[in-house]
Amino acid sequence: MYLVRGSLGGAARDGEMRSRVLCDVLYKYTAEGDRRKSIYKHVNNTLGKLLKGAQPKRRSGLEFYTQKLVMAVRLLFDSNAGIRKVYRGVRGELVDLEFYREKQQSREQVQWNSFTSTSMARDAALNFAGGGGVLFVITRDPEHAAAADIHEYSQFPNEQEVLLLPMQVFDVQGVHDRGGHTEIVLREVPHYPAELP
């Protein structure tokens, strides 16, 4: 069993049950552990690697979690929060730097098909990158309702997590060697994926 921080309160118009379910799903998404405690690996591996942007099967656990996470992000979205820059740290061996260099040179956009955990805190993201890792620096449009600050509902609130919806599109603005890590600078391209639940 796990404890839930925060409440979606007034944001959930159909009562406390929806609020509780969305808080639970956000907490499970940010939790560490096996699939009973944590869902982020299962959800993102399936969305990003197996489905590659396709919709989850109807009435599956994946569809349930995808719908609830999308709903939570949309309910928590606040254009007044002014979240213009977020960071994502990834171990170096997990990122194809040449892919991003090619996309920058060809001016082609990149799309991330899974939910993406980012942070408002550069240092928190650098901790995830580790030595020789990659730091994504993402400039976003604060009016684009495709990300939300979820730190209040997280198992790790100090990480200052901002969750991005799947199917986000970015322009690659730079790939830079910063000595201890590589920095990939992305600019979010505002759009609204029509197929998301």
Show the residue positions of the predicted features.
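Internal glycine-rich, Lys/Arg-flanked active-site/core loops of soluble domains
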Residues: 1-152
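Short, ordered beta-strand-loop transition motifs
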Residues: 79-80, 175-180
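Short glycine-/polar-rich loops that comprise or flank the Walker A/P-loop
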Residues: 133, 167-168
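A structural detector for beta-sheet-dominated domains
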Residues: 138-141, 165, 187
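Flexible, small-/acidic-enriched active-site or ligand-binding loops
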Residues: 143-167
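Short solvent-exposed strand/turn elements
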Residues: 179-197
